[in-house]
């Protein structure tokens, strides 16, 4: 925390100065005029004398009041609160007082300013202008146009800078914010509020600041701030990004530790300080009860959305920044909490001299009254800056009218909306209209002249002062030992690493599934793989299998870290945020993540290698074993650091996985086993030299074979008729054998087969360690200097054809969202208060198809009770809630964050998936809910969950086609969609894509689309809305509420949760259901005019009277103790249960049940159907939507294409035109084997897109009964097949022809039929890849776990397919795995199709030289052997026989159980495996993901 210093001596001087100033004024004028502006200026000038800055109080009374207040606090060190007998300083006490605590801290700092060195910082700027690159390529790239778009953008990037490429986001503006002043930034979304805050916080990566701009932070430049004081000027973004599996307490304590100052007080250790500070902010923002609850996110259960927002606020507050820029920080907070947050900022500003700025979209009058300064922005122009109390008066003098009951903030913002502002009578032609006219008026005003004068004085003052040195001293005093004074960080690099390691262990503790799964998976794979090579013999027959086992061991250790790339992308946005807060260096986090992974890596290595080494029967020697394990560990480290480096330099997971896989393929092929070193092609030999895995493999082979003698397992010739032949006339077939010798030296074998030597063993360990250190340095450097994602102005994306139409349509207008750039700037829709007028409901009513459905049914509930099990404890979330929603009424559902509002909506709409409804009834017209209930309602969720690749119109049509009655024609549904687009004023962006944040719809547009998706379904019963105004500006929130009012007026029943209703918005609701903590009802009844009925109820039962100027919503939250820091006088749940109003509610529910149940029910069979559309229609629409999603995701498709092309070409050219000798046949077999390597990456690329579809379906579409689970899963499976066939075809051509397999079909003139079959096999493999990925994801929650499972299954398939070990080698209990392995049949089919029916010609070094007995020719000696063993011989000049073990490729195929006659059978079996995958995907998805039955269990009374 920061502060300014003022000694008691200075305080007395100020008091004396004030009294002197007053007396001199009276003396000279002889008349008392009160405390006027002149006096105020004198006081401020005096204050500057003492503090080198302007004092925050504008009056002597305020200053004296401040001095009095400071005398009330003890000024003690509060961090060891257990030893202080003052509950107001103890954050764990119910009597904790945040304001008292802050005052005490200020007094503590002032008690020893030389030690604490409190600091403060203001900002002033002149001619501030921000501009960005205009992006004309605002169409969504697809597979067909993505490359062209990339090329054109690249060309434009290298063009010389010219003004046409840029547009101004912020026009020239001036302002000054002094320490102690709280400033609010007002403007509609897109006005430039976020850009202004980012500019002040020096967070400008992605846009530029004009050269003419002058910015100073009390004498410090923006460069100084960015380089040395980054954590003292922060920008808190609107989004909440946290590690979901960390608890709230751990999240905040981590931030507190990293900003713990060195000068925190004598005897206070860091941990005590950090825990105390975290507790203080948890208590301040009402988070103490969530200390041990996970933060969570949209998909991981945790605290509520409002509480998560408060966690973000608390985390930013703990940074202790002097200048804090808050961007829409109150989004998702209830009105009382939002007010409390602004009060906390005010307290910090007034007492600790901080300089907070906050852009706020919904600001109550109570909140506005707390602000000192206000900035009003209009399309990038500053149209006012000054005292908040003067702004309203300034614009009223200009000629604008402020309506009654409209808050000042709403009035100021409404001036930037032409449809909402209203000039005073007689000023219609005098007031400015455009943003430029407003700015011109402002810059010609006396207020602006006064401002420029003050700014000029401030700049002169900054030049004269020694702030730079004073501020540096204060900064250095806070820094821990071993921290560079110029560093922006508070703690040293090694402390950052230490805290990062501790946090990562807490993350693992919060979600141990991935490390446990990884270790368990390694153990299982160790057992499986080692059992394949179980107990290898000590003969030459084990040479190949010993090498294969070592090869697999190296690969498994090397690539066990591949999935670490995925976790990097999860953490990246959080690390970038913390870097901007100056909590830690990204490099410190990178090192911490590596250190914290060490125990997991060691556990994984032990679980695999200990089992594998001894079961395979590698060399039983302690020294040899520990060398093996040492090399394996370093191999894991090298590859982990390499994969992390790839992830650090990539911008997306698919972009990282593709090069990682190609690299993996290169390393596998050039390890030295697949292609032995002597057989590598000359052009590619260098790859082996830079391959760290190759060095590991060589050392491990040397470690295993050097100095050992192996018994020969096979002689040539041998068998019947050769029993009595002398060893001198036989030779061992193993490489390195010596004629006549029964033993083969392992050293000679390595030298002959691989050119491996013992002298390289320890050298290679050093090289491997060098690689590990090198890649670690690369990784740390990349994370440190990577600037992260560039900020982009919001642009709206259209399809290319739609964009041209849109540009033609809006060419005449170029107004609107200035932050959005040229394209979005053309979206000029109006959010006027009367946005939805009656004409829109009636203008098309005559057609019949677009009439809004009338509703005559009443939904009500009684004694609804819901509980969940949290850590073996049953916790009641809703406690006997009663209520109803009648047609034509809007019922507001309110309560503090976490009170159970969303849970109640989920229970009422039958959307709960966890927990149990233990009691209560939900009835429609007195009848229990039937199967069509969910289809009869609309549910507008708080999260705007949409597919980013669909357009607005497509999303609405998809909902209409599947949710409206199947009897309604397509044209009528399309007409209704157009009607809703017009109704919600989405015409300008109806053909825009949803997109992602920054490139797509903005928050307001997404909310309108969410509402629209439900409206086009024509919900006949009622409409639920969960926080529909969250994140919207006041005008848009108002227009949404007016829209709800119009819907209700046309018979719709609406139940709506709302957080921050102004008095105006509250007036739009008819009834209120208010929940207090624990899901208990505090009130259900009419609101009355100006909420008077509700106010009367609470005042009747003992509440303090509601002030006339108070917002009833905020007052009510205070009364029931739902606002942070407030305490209820009584339990209002008990008050409600004992009230006459409660009895009236119960009687009304009983009356409705009795009366309504007598009404006739709708007996239309179609009305009772679970889904409106038939299954075939659901399937077709879902499949097409998924195909379109992939087509509009060119990054995914091109990553897939790049992967298969690069992998296939690399594979094909590594084995280019493989010869038909013995090594060549083995190379061709391994080429087929390597062809499967991209499997893992293809699955990992696909999973995120499957998850996106599944999230949209399970979160929104399944509960709404849009379409069935079977249509969803069938559509996902079907839509992937065309793309897999396409990439399979590309892979076939890139691999089949370079490898030269077609040459093997030439002798039998079967090139075409064998080529066609090979194409079918290759494409079938790619289809199998997709179905296997979907199978693994069908029942998995996390994509990481599905990817791990797919890797496990893939490894098993590779291991048991017969390439590395055939059925004659496998232990008996694994034969079943060979038989039921799809890759067995695929490999057999591909090998037989590619290699069959041609001749073998041995290379010179492959011949075995045999000397026949004296007097015998080679023919007579070897012909009997060749007849049963195969092969051929050549007679050499010296009479010896050069024997080749094979003469036909069919002999080789037979040795690997691949028969040409079975090729079509094997293809058919592989297709059957694809079908099995599809069937299992459907079954497992139904078992694991489809809700069955209901969550209702009634207690028997």
Swiss-Prot record:
Induction: The distal promoter mediates the miconazole response whereas the proximal promoter (-345/+1) contains all the regulatory domains required for its induction by various other stresses. The promoter also contains a steroid responsive region (SRR) conferring beta-oestradiol and progesterone inducibility. Transcription is positively regulated by NCB2, NTD80 and TAC1 and repressed by FCR1. Disruption phenotype: Leads to hypersusceptibility to the antifungal agents terbinafine and amorolfine, and to the metabolic inhibitors cycloheximide, brefeldin A, and fluphenazine. Shows a decreased number of germ tube-forming cells in the presence of estradiol when CDR2 is also deleted. Changing residue 668 to A: Leads to selective drug-sensitivity. Changing residue 667 to A: Leads to selective drug-sensitivity. SUPFAM superfamilies: P-loop containing nucleoside triphosphate hydrolases. The keyword Cell membrane applies. Residues 1137-1164 form a coiled coil. Residues 1-513, 570-597, 644-654, 786-1195, 1251-1280, 1336-1355, 1488-1501 are cytoplasmic. ATP binds at residues 895-902. Changing residue 673 to A: Leads to selective drug-sensitivity. Residues 535-548, 619-622, 676-764, 1217-1229, 1302-1314, 1377-1466 are extracellular. Keywords: Antibiotic resistance, ATP-binding, Cell membrane, Coiled coil, Cycloheximide resistance, Membrane, Nucleotide-binding, Repeat, Transmembrane, Transmembrane helix, Transport. Changing residue 672 to A: Leads to selective drug-sensitivity. Its main location: membrane. Changing residue 326 to A: Impairs NBD ATP-binding. Changing residue 669 to A: Leads to general drug-sensitivity. Pleiotropic ABC efflux transporter that confers resistance to numerous chemicals including anisomycin, cycloheximide, fluconazole, miconazole, ketoconazole, itriconazole, nystatin, terbinafine, amorolfine, brefeldin A, amphotericin B, fluphenazine, as well as estrogen. Plays a role in farnesol-induced apoptotic process through glutathione efflux activity. Mediates in-to-out translocation of membrane phospholipids including aminophospholipids and thus regulates asymmetric distribution of phosphatidylethanolamine. Exhibits nucleoside triphosphatase activity. Belongs to the ABC transporter superfamily. Contains 2 cytoplasmic nucleotide binding domains (NBDs). The N-terminal NBD has ATPase activity. The 2 NBDs are asymmetric and non-exchangeable and the drug efflux by CDR1 involves complex interactions between the two halves of the protein. This is Pleiotropic ABC efflux transporter of multiple drugs CDR1. It comes from Candida albicans (strain SC5314 / ATCC MYA-2876) (Yeast). The lineage of its organism: Eukaryota, Fungi, Dikarya, Ascomycota, Saccharomycotina.
